[in-house]
């Protein structure tokens, strides 16, 4: 199998997933804008042990798993580099965001009581202050969190977007073959039903009221920046929890985050879209981000990854030229990341700087280009989760021997972005997993994250 054949197959997977969120059926609107959306494939993928993320602790679920809450918070806190290959920058989102909140410098603005009242009224629709017990002192302290109305709005919006992405993915897949195009009108109405139901649920839950408040905040914040940043800091602190307490009372709070749907880590989760490289012509684009932002270079080193773990490869190896007819099939879904502690719209406002901390555009250059030295160019908003991964080929003897040894002997092993064996991510017990290999076909158990979809952080700081 040639390098070009491998590249075409991996790019086909990349483009298929990217197009499902940035394209739309005729007359429809894409869920995300291609110019500000980035897909980063992992090499290798991150295998998920459901037990590590099930039933996370929350203030309303004090009997939940604190480890699951910690694992979730850390999973979504990585600040990746601007690349089509998932690369950890070494920074965390919560760390950089806190630095921005602590270091923001805003020129003095004349007070405007009318605007401040408008901002306060809108803010009350989205956030509320509740009393919580400080685990270190036992005292009741005020915490600023989302209102139930706003939380339901965001959850229902995420469910609608997931339904839309599933529908668009099915539509795009159907358009690849003549039979698919011919049968699409027969199944489209049925597939539209969950989309319409999700939309009605989202819009009927006070969406107009929430969006009016959001619009007021987005416009008024520019005229009351200091107040807006002060409120954002209170919200950030309100979601900090001492889950990983060392007993000294000095542990750094963990920013509580969540993933939707709540059973995302299970194969029984809903909203899956199928992909089969043999079912249709694998569509690739000459202008694909895969080629423009490092995907080709990342997988040019070889189809096989040996050793390493999620997103980190120790050694790459090319498939033998004698291996032919490689076929990859899987089902994928997008898992929405919720960080209620992060007020993203503030990063797009003007009229502030970070003094000597970060110069103009150092956090993010605001686009896909010129982000090489940026501290936090991307904000991950979704994980690409897959299940039912099957990989088959007419393997050469050397490749078959390699696969047999790795699926039976343990150790980190991957094909393309798919992890075939190794240690589960986030598992304190260091549990391992491995795929089955029979009759030339590899069957991978469970679910794994093979990519991250991010939004580009606006020019930050703006001055």
What are these regions, as identified by a protein language model?
Residues 1-204:
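Intrinsically disordered, low-complexity, charge-biased terminal/linker regions in eukaryotic proteins
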Residues 2-9, 19, 33, 37-73, ...:
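Membrane-permeabilization and membrane-interfacing ectodomains
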């Amino acid at each position: 199998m040639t390098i070009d054949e491998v590249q075409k197959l991996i790019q086909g997977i990349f483009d298929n997933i990217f197009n499902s969120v940035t394209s739309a059926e005729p007359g429809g609107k894409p869920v995300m804008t291609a110019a500000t959306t980035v897909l980063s494939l992992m090499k290798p993928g991150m295998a998920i042990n459901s037990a590590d993320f099930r039933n996370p602790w929350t203030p309303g679920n004090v009997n939940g798993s604190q480890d699951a809450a910690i694992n979730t918070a850390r999973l979504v806190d990585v600040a990746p580099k601007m690349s089509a290959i998932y690369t950890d920058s070494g920074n965390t989102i919560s760390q950089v965001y806190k630095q921005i909140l602590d270091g923001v410098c805003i020129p003095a603005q004349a007070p405007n009581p009318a605007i401040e009242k408008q901002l306060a009224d809108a803010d009350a629709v989205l956030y509320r202050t509740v009393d919580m017990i400080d685990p270190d002192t036992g005292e009741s302290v005020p915490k600023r969190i989302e209102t139930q109305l706003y939380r339901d709005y965001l959850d229902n919006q995420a469910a609608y977007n997931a339904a839309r992405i599933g529908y668009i993915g099915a539509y795009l897949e159907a358009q690849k073959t003549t039979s698919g195009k011919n049968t699409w009108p027969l199944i489209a109405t049925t597939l539209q039903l969950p989309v319409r139901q999700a939309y009605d649920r989202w819009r009927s839950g006070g969406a107009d009221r929430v969006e009016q408040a959001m619009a007021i905040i987005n416009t008024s914040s520019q005229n009351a920046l200091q107040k807006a940043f002060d409120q954002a800091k209170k919200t950030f602190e309100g979601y900090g929890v001492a889950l990983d307490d060392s007993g000294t009372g000095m542990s750094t709070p963990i920013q509580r985050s969540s993933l939707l749907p709540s059973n995302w880590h299970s194969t029984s989760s809903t909203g899956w879209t199928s992909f089969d490289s043999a079912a249709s012509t694998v569509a690739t684009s000459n202008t694909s981000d895969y080629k423009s932002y490092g995907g080709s270079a990342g997988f040019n080193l070889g189809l096989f990854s040996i050793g390493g773990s999620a997103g980190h490869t120790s050694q790459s190896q090319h498939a033998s030229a004698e291996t032919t007819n490689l076929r990859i099939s899987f089902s994928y879904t997008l898992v929405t990341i919720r960080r209620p502690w992060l007020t993203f719209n503030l990063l797009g406002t003007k009229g502030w700087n970070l003094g000597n901390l970060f110069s103009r555009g150092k956090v993010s250059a605001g686009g896909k280009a010129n982000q090489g030295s940026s501290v936090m160019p991307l904000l991950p908003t979704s994980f690409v989760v897959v299940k039912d991964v099957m990989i088959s080929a007419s393997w050469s003897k050397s490749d078959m021997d390699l696969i047999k040894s790795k699926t039976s002997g343990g150790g980190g092993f991957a094909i393309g972005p798919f992890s075939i064996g190794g240690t589960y991510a986030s598992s304190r017990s260091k549990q391992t997993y491995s795929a089955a290999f029979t009759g030339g076909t590899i069957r991978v158990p469970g679910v794994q994250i093979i990519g991250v979809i991010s939004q580009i952080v606006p020019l930050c700081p703006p001055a």
